[in-house]
UniProtKB/Swiss-Prot annotation:
Entry similarity comment: Belongs to the thiolase-like superfamily. Chalcone/stilbene synthases family.
Single GO biological process annotation from the record: flavonoid biosynthetic process
Control of this protein's activity: Inhibited by glutathione.
Active site feature: 164
Catalyses which reaction(s): 4-coumaroyl-CoA + malonyl-CoA + H2O + H(+) = 4-hydroxybenzalacetone + 2 CO2 + 2 CoA; (E)-4-coumaroyl-CoA + 3 malonyl-CoA + 3 H(+) = 2',4,4',6'-tetrahydroxychalcone + 3 CO2 + 4 CoA
Protein name: Polyketide synthase 4
Assembly with partners or alone: Homodimer.
Pathway connected to this protein: Secondary metabolite biosynthesis; flavonoid biosynthesis
Species in which this protein is naturally found: Rubus idaeus (Raspberry)
Record keywords, A-Z: Acyltransferase, Chromophore, Hydroxylation, Transferase
InterPro entries, sorted: Chalcone/stilbene_synt_C (IPR012328), Chalcone/stilbene_synt_N (IPR001099), Chalcone/stilbene_synthase_AS (IPR018088), Polyketide_synthase_type-III (IPR011141), Thiolase-like (IPR016039)
Tissues where this protein is expressed: Expressed in fruits.
Family matches, as PROSITE patterns: CHALCONE_SYNTH
Purpose of the protein: Bifunctional polyketide synthase producing both 4-hydroxybenzalacetone and naringenin chalcone. Can use p-coumaryl-CoA and ferulyl-CoA as substrates. Catalyzes the initial key reaction step in the biosynthesis of phenylbutanoids.
Length: 383
């Protein structure tokens, strides 16, 4: 007679979860950061706000961003002028766009991940879909199943309104799914577009301007599974450990509220200090049991919340400049893509690094909690 323990053991994988493939995509519309203030104040009919525009120009100049990709074009915004105002009701127009475009963009990245994986998409057993946009029923997870032609029996998890820390969260969830379901292959999709947050400027809400200067559109997809098939699947990273914590005294530091005007963004000035003040405690709790105390001995995959956060983390931990190089590259070339950023950075690290067996650290921050993962790096040559 089979015992319950034997059944449970048979349901679990033998080894740890691994990242088996990565795919990324963006909308085709590319926006240069140096000229964005002129465009933004013109399209929002705010050119008369000269001092505010000068402040926004300084924000963009200091952002470390060269360009971003955005679904919203000038033509779309001219057809939806309410989205260009600061407080005009516009949620219906925004929703009509995102419920179509979020899964559509997700399909592009998922297609690339499946191609790299080299296995038929019929072998996908689980789907984790994450976005800050487009709350709807049925959700973007269901729409992707239909668009992509996945099996109707794929087990789905839809994550809305998670924010910037969600890049670490989806990896943690995918790890649990892969390790507790023998043979599971988890398709993860993080699809983000700024349709819900774009709005005109306000003299009294400068943190909204910070968001307009930083956020961009992008989607990333990964496939996660344990016990990779020899000679068939090529593991890129091993997901060793995952943790999450809420920072003390951080309530209200980062907030987003869905209103008739869209998703409003609220950010306190002390966010970089909050993170840098608490980061070493989290690092010690995570790595001391592994006898790792040299933060420069790790690969870093840090979510690029903004230049001030990166600068203070680097200074607090005494990190060498190259440790956050991949993060800086993604911030420069794409801006802050919320949940998708960490997966974009994973892609950069695996493509540029020739290291083998090195511990990797992921840091994703938002709302305001930290998601921590430890990864082991596999040597892998891209064809």
């Amino acid at each position: 007679m089979v015992t319950v323990e034997e059944v449970r053991k048979a349901q679990r994988a033998e080894g740890p979860a691994t990242v088996l493939a990565i795919g990324t995509a963006t909308p085709p519309n590319c926006v240069g950061q140096s000229t964005y203030p002129d465009y933004y104040f013109r399209i929002t009919n705010s050119e008369h706000k000269i001092e505010l525009k000068q402040k926004f120009q300084r924000m963009c100049d200091k952002s470390m961003i060269k360009k971003r990709y955005m679904y919203l074009t000038e033509e779309i915004l001219k057809e939806n002028p309410s989205m260009c105002e600061y407080m005009a009701p516009s949620l219906d127009a925004r929703q009509d766009m995102v419920i179509v475009e979020i899964p559509k963009l997700g399909k592009e990245a998922a297609t690339k991940a499946i191609k790299e994986w080299g296995q038929p998409k019929s072998k996908i057993t689980h789907l984790v879909f994450c976005t800050t946009s487009g709350v709807d029923m049925p959700g973007a997870d269901y729409q992707l199943i239909k668009l992509f032609g996945l099996r109707p029996s794929v087990k789905r998890l839809m994550m809305y309104q998670q924010g910037c820390f969600a890049g670490g969260t989806v990896l943690r969830l995918a790890k649990d799914l892969a390790e507790n379901n023998r043979g599971a292959r988890v398709l993860v999709v993080c699809s983000e577009i700024t349709v819900v947050t774009f709005r005109g400027p306000s003299d009294t809400h400068l943190d909204c301007l910070v968001g307009q200067a930083l956020f961009g559109d992008g989607v990333a997809s990964i496939i996660v599974g344990a016990d990779p098939l020899p000679e068939i699947e090529k593991p890129l990273f091993e997901l060793v450990s995952a943790a999450q914590t809420i920072l003390p005294d951080s309530e209200g530091a980062i907030e987003g509220h869905l209103r008739e005007v869209g998703l409003t963004f609220h950010l306190l000035e002390n966010v970089p200090a909050l993170i840098s003040k608490n980061i070493e405690k989290s690092l010690n709790e995570t790595f001391k049991p592994l006898d790792i105390m040299d933060w420069n001995s790790l690969f870093w995959i840090a979510h690029p919340g903004g230049p001030a956060i990166l600068d203070q983390v680097e200074a607090k931990l005494g990190l060498k400049p190259e440790k956050l190089e991949a993060t800086g590259h993604i911030l420069s070339e794409y801006g802050n893509m919320s949940s998708a950023c960490v997966l974009f950075i994973l892609d950069v690290v695996r493509r540029k690094s020739a290291a083998n067996g090195v511990t990797t650290r992921i840091l994703s921050i938002g709302q305001i909690s930290k998601s921590l993962l430890i990864l082991a790096w596999f040597l892998f040559s891209l064809v």
